[in-house]
Amino acid sequence: NAAMYVRADSDIESLEDMEGHSLAFADPNSASGYLVPRFQLQQAGLDIDTYFSRTGFGGGHEQAVIAVLDEQYDAGVTWVSGQGDPAEGYTRGNLRRMVDNGLLDMSDLRIIWTSNLIPNGPWVVRKALPQEAKDIWSGWMENLHETDYECYKQVSQGEGPGFGRVDHSFFENIVAMRQRELEGSR
């Protein structure tokens, strides 16, 4: 998921309160930190260029959080798992990583909006590998959360239900969003 956050001491309580305020996207190449929030906000009827007083890029997910905490922007967007307690930074994602690394106290932020689910980036294998090697790799990844949960948490960067096989169709909506974004910038 993408999550829009503000400082906890902000008067902004919801997306509706964001009208006329500034928004930091994380990175132009990020699905959760730019592409999906921008698309879903537009789908909700918001004109990004006029609804917000200004938008910009924070220079990355962590940097956008810091920019909001330093009052350079009123709100920012970042990636979160959407699972677990928001007050702890969820189970995975940028906020959780910042909390775990001592860079963020979630009591300093408030989540005001979350996107629909966003597929995580894929784990892939070369087509040229022998089928047996592909099956071994895929089986190991699919069972990792059961066979070695601590390893799974390191690989997935947090808690979660495990990995599963998907094909290209699973990512088609992200590809389509990116293509629309590129066409709109021409």
Residue ranges, per PLM feature:
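Extracytoplasmic/secreted envelope proteins and their assembly/folding machinery
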Residues: 15, 38, 65, 134, ...
